[in-house]
């Protein structure tokens, strides 16, 4: 059955990577195939932690999507972008830096796709007022979103998958990855002038930007206060997980439920933000990966990787980091991480007696998150941004994105390698 499981998975992966077929349909078709043949049973799918659907991931995404959907109704994201542009006093470079920081922070608290969807429209507005090219700003923002998303458990879907499989908490991500993300963001800001060159703007255009009223962006102040209160409670519960022992997925669902009750929005308004295609895609993917786990394919790969690295935790971590970045750049990092987590879990189990056994998990998360910047299809946020740019009449080619993204990815992965080496293999010994 292992040959059947591998054949179905590889075929589905190729179709997903081609971006020519609906990826949700492919994932669900592949899932149906491994069930019908049958490689995996319904009990494995719904109840097994190792081979089934990861319900923690699904419900965390549902909860956060609803929370973000309600928050979107307030106009707070548009307010923040306009505020940043005015504080920069019309300077293109300063505007870019502030929007990069806003994008990174928003991605850490929400997710990078949502951040791009919310920040990009205002970026287009500001660039139109300044009469400057939007492509540089949009690319800088999506780079920052993918980097910032690495900082927290909820910032990027790959992190959610890693956390669920490895048993890592919101605090673990804050403690281990946020310091590196800050360093990488500083490096990104430092290379922005070299990446995009000098951008000039006329004085009267600056006056137009300064005339924008960010206060008008807020559409519902009462709802904004309610959202703020619920978000404080949600993130407090994330941070208090070691004490409360409440799963992040349950916290997100409770927060979403509270906002549904207090917001007064209709069902269509708060459910419209739930990306059902994404959730079904995850479910299908988990089932196909579960088939690989059940048939022993993942176990065999883990043992082969252990032999390649001699079972050394340092070599294993750097192998995962080095492989994850380019692969995540070629294909979407979500299916890649869903495939790799059982493999890394097996590797960690084999090397359980060594110190710093969480390091391969951090290497996987960083490689996937930062590698998403490599090409235009490396992360879902990139695809969304390209669509926005195309509709705005400023299309970005695959290779234009890749030339810039390759530089950002190389710098990010180099800093990640140094960080992992120093923090987990030098300073701890």
From Swiss-Prot:
It comes from the Bacteria. It is a multi-pass membrane protein. This is Uncharacterized transporter Mb2703. It is found in: Cell membrane. The keyword Transmembrane helix applies. Its main location: membrane. InterPro entries: Arsenical_pump_ArsB (IPR000802), Cit_transptr-like_dom (IPR004680), Diverse_Ion_Transporter (IPR051475). The chain crosses the membrane at residues 26-46, 51-71, 99-119, 135-155, 173-193, 223-243, 278-298, 311-331, 361-381, 407-427. The keyword Protein transport does not apply. One of its GO terms (cellular component) is plasma membrane. It holds the Pfam family CitMHS. Belongs to the CitM (TC 2.A.11) transporter family. Keywords: Cell membrane, Membrane, Transmembrane, Transmembrane helix, Transport. It comes from Mycobacterium bovis (strain ATCC BAA-935 / AF2122/97). GO terms for molecular function: arsenite transmembrane transporter activity.
């Amino acid at each position: 059955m292992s040959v059947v499981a591998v054949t179905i998975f590889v075929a589905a992966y190729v179709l997903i990577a081609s971006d020519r077929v609906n990826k949700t349909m492919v994932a669900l078709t592949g899932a149906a195939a491994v069930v019908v043949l049958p490689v995996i049973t319904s009990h494995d799918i719904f109840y097994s932690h190792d081979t089934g659907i990861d319900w923690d991931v699904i419900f965390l995404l549902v909860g956060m999507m609803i929370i973000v959907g309600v928050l979107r109704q307030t106009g707070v994201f548009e307010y923040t972008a306009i505020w940043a542009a005015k504080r920069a006093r019309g300077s293109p470079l300063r505007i870019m830096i502030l929007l990069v920081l806003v994008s990174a922070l928003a991605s850490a608290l929400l997710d990078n796709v949502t951040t791009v969807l919310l920040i990009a429209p205002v970026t287009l507005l500001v660039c139109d007022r300044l009469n400057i090219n939007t492509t540089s700003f949009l690319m800088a923002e999506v780079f920052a979103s993918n980097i910032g998303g690495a900082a927290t458990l909820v910032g990027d879907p790959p992190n959610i998958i890693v956390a669920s499989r490895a048993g890592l908490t919101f605090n673990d991500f804050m403690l281990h990855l946020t310091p590196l993300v800050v360093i990488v963001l500083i490096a990104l800001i430092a290379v922005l002038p070299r990446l995009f060159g000098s951008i000039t703007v006329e004085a009267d255009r600056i006056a137009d930007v300064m005339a924008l009223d960010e206060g008008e962006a807020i559409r519902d102040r009462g709802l904004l206060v309610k959202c703020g209160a619920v978000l404080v409670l949600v993130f407090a519960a994330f941070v208090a997980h070691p004490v409360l022992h409440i799963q992040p997925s349950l916290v997100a669902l409770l927060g979403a439920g509270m906002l549904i009750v207090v917001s007064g929005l209709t069902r269509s308004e708060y459910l419209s933000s739930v990306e059902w295609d994404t959730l079904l895609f995850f479910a299908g993917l988990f089932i196909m990966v579960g088939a690989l786990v059940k048939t022993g394919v993942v176990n065999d790969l883990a043992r082969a990787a252990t032999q390649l690295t001699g079972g050394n935790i340092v070599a294993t971590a750097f192998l995962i980091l080095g492989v994850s970045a380019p692969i995540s750049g070629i294909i979407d990092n979500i299916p890649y991480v869903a495939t790799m987590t059982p493999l890394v879990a097996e590797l960690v189990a084999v090397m359980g007696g060594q110190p710093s056994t969480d390091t391969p998990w951090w290497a996987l998360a960083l490689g996937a998150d930062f590698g998403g910047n490599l090409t235009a299809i490396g992360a879902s946020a990139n695809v969304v941004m390209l669509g926005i740019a195309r509709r705005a009449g400023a299309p970005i080619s695959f290779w234009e994105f890749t030339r810039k993204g390759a530089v950002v990815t190389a710098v990010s992965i180099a800093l990640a390698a140094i960080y992992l080496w120093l923090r987990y293999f030098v300073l701890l010994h």
